[in-house]
Amino acid sequence: MLVQLGAAVAVLAVTAGVGPTGRFDVPVNGFAAATTVLREGSPESVGLDPAPIEAAKATIAGSPLFPGAVTLLAHDGVIVDRTATGKAVRYADATTELPAEQQVPMRVDTIFDVASVTKLFTSIAVLGLVEDGKVDIEKPVSTYLPEFGVNGKATITVKHLLTHTSGLEPFIPLWRDYPDKAARIKAVMDHAPSAPPGSVYTYSDLNLITLGVLVERQRGESLDSVVTKRITTPLGLTDTGYNPPASKRDRIAATEYQTTPARGMVRGEVHDENAWSLGGVAGHAGVFSTAEDLAVLGQTILNGGTYRGKRILREATVREMLTNHNAAYPGNAHGLGFELDQRWYMGGLAGPRTAGHTGFTGTSLVLDPASRSIAVLLTNRVHPVRTNGSINSAREALASGLARALAVRPRQGPTAWYTATGGATLLTGPLRSTGPVSVSFAAFVDTDAGDSLVVEFEDGGEWRALPLRVSGPGAPEQEVSGLSGSGHRSWWTVHAIGPVGAPVTVRWRYVTDSRYSGRGVTLDRITVTDSRRILLDGEKQPHLIRPLGWGPKTR
């Protein structure tokens, strides 16, 4: 049976929580209405700012890391943008570009090998077994696959596999070292873990290969048949499945030109060598899909497991998929199938409830229950070779573009100061005080853990940080030297005490590293006082504040 819900998912217990459309600063609890069906619309129709979306699309269109891409963004049940850019097929081999007339343009309905996004389909199939009473995730895998319980794996549970805490290593070259499918599956069943079960987080294809076998054994039919009957057909995902038919080849994006094994330019067959050696159907890879089909899957999850009247999972099961079961492994939050709160590809949408997955071929799906938003990025980044480099910057850019399109309303008045740029400063002029200076302001902070907003005063030509006292949902309980964090999606009230002396100059500085970013920082209600008077009222005297990298925003 499913594990008991913890306090971490209590916020999802209320179905169809109501919140204003287009807002980042008013997180929504519960699932979307079960009747929500994706429809076409504009960003403006659901209260989004189109400018950050266009900026993100420009970043992706200009990326040298992949020949082409399809993006899809949805909010509150509305597809606000879908765009195709570049080429679905550009190369004849590892280095030779096709003549221009032979290259295949990307289309919004191009079909992609989604690689490890397949793991979500397998996880849903496993949880269907749980709902049917055929599997208990707390029981050893060997309960259902007796041959698995050898070589130190007797205590590995189904939950360990779903959360990548089994101790199994990431990968073994089944396609190279074993002669046929039966031998390859046996190799997985026989393989010894590299760490004790439950002692470490290690993302492993072997976990999901095993779960695929478990699904087949318990259902008495092939994994692709189970996925078709229980997921893609009910949801109407007509372009999603394994081993796509030849009739759809013209719409399929090419992946890699492979020489070992000697497969040539791979198009319409799974790119992953192990999945290919297993007949194209495996628990870890093999699914092909489109941006729209993945968006429908995402909306199904946001709806609590149902779409167009077809339920594929119960709400309680979906809550478990969106619950962090890996609290013991900071930075590796994971539900039952979904990754959670991964800034490196979820960007400004990242938060404790944000769910998603990526694929090696250059794919990603991000679901943000707090704003009921979806970001899909599908690329052919391994075309023509897998050494093209990481596309995480593009993944992050798309998700952050959607996050920045969502509004954060000023705390007071028509505008607030906003930045998403590292090194940005807000600077007051010299303020003449007669005693200790008190600085207060409202801050909306959504940053990577390594980034922070600091408040400083000038002291003899040097800048010194002021200690900050913060209040509000999710605010630090102790005095801090800088503001950082994400997931709370709420305004904080901040106070600091400055030095005695005149004149005093105060600055707010957003300090970032070179890794990942959040939605950014918004400041409002800036006030500087001494014991006798108001030295600066930012609402009435914005001309006394000099912005460098900040700008006034209405949202």
Give residue spans per PLM region.
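Secretory targeting and sorting signals
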Residues: 1-23
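Short, surface-exposed loop or secondary-structure junction motifs
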Residues: 29-31, 83, 88-90, 94, ...
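Short, conserved catalytic-motif segment at the N-terminal edge
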Residues: 38-112, 136
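Short, conserved phosphate/pyrophosphate- and ester-handling motifs at nucleotide-, phospho-/glycolipid
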Residues: 49, 119, 290
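Active-site SXXK
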Residues: 53-60, 71, 77, 110-139, ...
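Structural recognition of the beta-strand scaffold that forms the well-ordered cores
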Residues: 70-73, 81-82, 113, 160-162, ...
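Short, glycine/proline-biased beta-turn/loop segments that scaffold the active-site neighborhood
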Residues: 136-152, 233-235
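Beta-sandwich/jellyroll recognition modules and their flexible linkers
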Residues: 323-325, 351-352, 361-363, 370-373, ...
